[in-house]
UniProtKB/Swiss-Prot annotation:
This is Mitochondrial division protein 1. Pfam families: WD40 (PF00400). It comes from the Eukaryota. Residues 359-375 have a biased composition (Basic residues). Residues 122-147, 313-380 are annotated as: Disordered. Belongs to the WD repeat MDV1/CAF4 family. The keyword Mitochondrion applies. InterPro entries: G-protein_beta_WD-40_rep, WD40/YVTN_repeat-like_dom_sf, WD40_repeat_CS, WD40_repeat_dom_sf, WD40_rpt. It is a peripheral membrane protein. One of its GO terms (molecular function) is ubiquitin binding. Residues 228-268 form a coiled coil. One of its GO terms (cellular component) is mitochondrial outer membrane.
């Protein structure tokens, strides 16, 4: 038998001893234990401590100041296991004689001795190693207490079947391994090996499932026997086996409780580490934000040639070395401020900054576009690959767990939302409300509100550097620097707005931006491409063919005042470099080349309006009012997969692992692309509070509902 199997048996035997002993002693009241007031054990222990049974005592050791030094020299403790050279030496100590030590260490109560089944049980019961009147007076109660729990012997006996079964199973596995090895060395086929394994597996399952009567008892003998003695013997044997099974059950229950305690401790440890990771990631976000601010300031200083390290150092040296009466020349400048970190901050000359600000404003008025803000956008794109950290805390939530909720974030249904990164910044908009609300996802609070649109905001996109572009029913596109609103919630909205694009003449229904390109779709049946370098429209694509016919000028002009829920002509747009994908009301997905402004491929299959789409390097996923999701292979232009829901699809996003869908139901639908399985998260599937909009990034999902609630989930 292997050492691992022997270790398991010893461990199981130890648990058996512990559990049985706890049942024996736990079944008796405190007054009935061997440590009761009149117990001989207590008397012997008292004699040992007070030196009644020996030449020295624990009390004398304590008074003399001698210390117990384990493993260094010969111990003067009551029990010295490590220096006992023989059985007699085991009972020798410095506190009592050998006889007293033997009585203390070998004492067994009458209740324990009475439990040993033997033909001489009566003699064992009457003969005691130590007797005292108090012990005899409690014999009856001890026997009554014994009826409530098993003995040590019974516990040992109960462990034998488990040990025997372990030995038998191990021997069978050894035989099977030898047989398989011999078969592999021979010319046997794989089918023969599989049959042998199946036979062994079947025999093992049969062994576990079969239940038999105790040894020596057969069902046919019981049914044909007329001997009361034999039948009573069978009753006693079966009763004893039931007692053993009860002990085995208690052992198993004890193991379950032990595992539960370990799992609870592991859960507590996991929660502590989880909170530690959350705190670390918040610190990372804090440092990343300041790192970006420093980079922006460096760019501004380089652009306007404001570098004055030499002048600043010279001014600092003069300020620190000049006499007190000569420091009046700096009275017009603020004193050196002490930062929270304890470092001294030297104020920059105000003249250069003021002239730079005037120059910046003048340049902005001349070009009609804030060059500084545009440079910020370009720099942000270049710094995408320089980001040092990225949040991963959402990966450690249980799938489908609610991370946070903003109840009644908007008075009406949420029309659109987007966030920069998990636990970062979220922007959202509601129906019939032109206000954009900004939320901190790590602190779970509202941090700013931005105004500027004249009507409902119908679409938006946000990058990971807090640049937001929105489109509304007022036919306007606006670019925002959300970081300004976060840093100062009282700042005027016109300072948060970087630029306004105003060439459309009807509601903006879809937009997408990437690098220096912005593409927008409108109810005026045009798609416009914008250059973010100068804010100008560089191309207009006409899509009148999407639905046939033309809209009247009056209908176009009054579009942003219309509050009906007609589905948009252009339902979804995404651009990447020179590639553009559009989904329109006719159910057709068109792939465009922005360099030529022409359609290079059409994907037909939806029977109703396309409301959402997204593509990567391999696939294009589209959602439609026909309740279906279609996955297209961009390499061949063919349909790779499709599935449907009970209600129309209004919004979707995907990555390599999952597709998340909003379809006017009370939950977010999730499709696992690897396992081909569907599941949902977020409340009641049949709730009237339907999910209107979803955004999903790296396992972090945010959804907006018809009642204005916003929730974040880990998937």
């Amino acid at each position: 038998m292997s050492s691992g199997t022997s270790g398991d048996q010893i461990s199981h035997f130890g648990k058996t001893l512990t559990t049985t002993a706890s049942l024996v002693f736990g079944s008796q009241s405190m007054e009935d234990t061997i440590l009761s007031y009149s117990s001989p054990y207590k008397k012997i222990l008292h004699d040992t401590i007070t030196s009644s049974g020996g030449t020295s005592s624990l009390m004398k050791v304590e008074r003399s100041g001698r210390m117990f030094t384990p493993f260094r020299t010969r111990n003067s403790a009551f029990q010295d296991i490590f220096h006992a050279s023989s059985g007699r030496g085991y009972f020798k100590n410095g506190f009592s004689d050998t006889r007293t030590s033997f009585q203390v260490l070998s004492y067994l109560s009458d209740a324990m001795l009475a439990d040993i089944p033997s033909s001489e049980s009566a003699a064992a019961t009457s003969g005691k190693l130590v007797t005292e009147k108090g012990e005899k007076g409690k014999k009856k109660r001890a026997e009554t207490a014994h009826a409530r729990g098993p003995s040590l012997y019974q516990g040992f006996e109960a462990s034998l079947p488990t040990i025997n079964q372990t030995i038998t199973t191990h021997q069978k596995k050894q035989i099977m391994n030898r047989d398989i090895k011999s078969i592999r060395e021979s010319d046997a086929t794989p089918e023969d090996v599989g049959q042998d394994v199946d036979i062994e597996k079947g025999e093992e399952e049969t062994t576990h499932d079969e239940f038999t009567l105790p040894k020596g008892i057969k069902p046919e003998h019981l049914s044909n026997s007329y001997s009361i003695k034999n039948l009573k013997g069978a009753v006693q044997t079966i009763t004893d086996n039931l007692d053993l099974l009860e002990i085995q059950k208690n052992l198993a229950a004890s193991e379950i409780r032990e595992l539960d305690l370990k799992m609870e401790k592991l859960k507590l440890m996991r929660d502590l580490v989880f909170r530690r990771v959350a705190k670390i990631e918040q610190n990372e976000l804090f440092l990343e934000k300041h790192l970006m601010n420093i980079r922006e300031r460096i760019d501004m200083i380089e652009e306007y040639n404001l570098d004055n390290d030499t002048d600043a150092e010279k001014a600092y040296e003069e300020a620190t070395s000049a006499p007190e009466d000569t420091k009046d020349q700096y009275s017009e400048l603020p004193d050196a401020n002490t930062a929270e970190s304890g470092e001294t901050v030297v104020q920059e000359p105000q003249v250069n900054l003021a002239s730079a600000q005037k120059s910046l404003k003048k340049r902005s008025k001349q070009t009609g576009y804030s060059h500084k803000n545009h440079e910020k956008k370009v720099q942000q794109h270049e710094f995408r690959h320089l980001r040092k950290t990225y949040p991963t805390l959402q990966q450690y939530y249980e799938p489908g767990a609610n991370i946070l909720s903003f109840d009644s974030a908007h008075e009406d249904n949420v029309t659109c939302l987007d966030f920069n990164l998990p636990f970062g910044t979220l922007c959202s908009a509601g129906k019939l409300d032109p206000t954009i609300k900004v939320w901190n996802l790590s602190k779970n609070k509202h941090v700013a509100s931005i105004t500027g649109h004249l009507a409902t905001v119908s679409c938006m996109q946000m990058d990971q550097y807090n640049t937001l572009i929105t489109g509304g029913r007022d036919a306007l596109l606006k670019m925002w620097d959300i970081q300004k609103a976060i840093d100062n919630d009282s700042i005027p909205s016109d300072e948060v707005c970087i630029y306004t694009f105003d060439s459309h003449i009807d509601e903006i229904t879809a937009l997408s931006f990437e690098a220096n390109n912005l593409v927008s779709g409108s109810q005026d049946r045009t798609i416009r491409q914008w250059d973010l370098n100068n804010g100008k429209c560089v191309q207009t694509l006409d899509i009148n063919f999407a639905t046939g016919g033309n809209l009247s000028r009056s209908m176009i002009g009054s579009g942003f005042l219309n509050t009906n829920n007609d589905h948009p002509i252009i339902g979804a747009i995404q651009c990447y470099d020179a590639a553009l994908a559009t989904g329109t009301k006719d159910g057709i997905v068109r792939l465009w080349d922005l360099r030529s402004g022409r359609v290079v491929r059409t994907l037909e299959g939806h029977s109703d309006a396309v409301t959402s789409l997204q593509f990567d390097s391999l696939n294009l996923v589209t959602g439609s009012l026909d309740n279906s999701i279609r996955i297209w292979d961009l390499r061949t232009g063919t349909l790779a997969d499709t599935f449907s829901y009970e209600h129309p699809v209004t919004c979707l996003q995907f990555d390599l692992n999952k597709i998340v869908v909003a379809n006017q139901e009370g939950t977010v639908k999730v499709y696992n692309r690897q396992e081909k399985k569907h599941w949902f998260c977020g409340g009641d599937e049949h709730s009237e509070n339907a999910v209107e909009y979803v955004r999903y990034k790296d396992g972090y999902l945010v959804e907006g509902r018809a009642n204005g609630d916003i929730n974040a989930w880990a998937i």
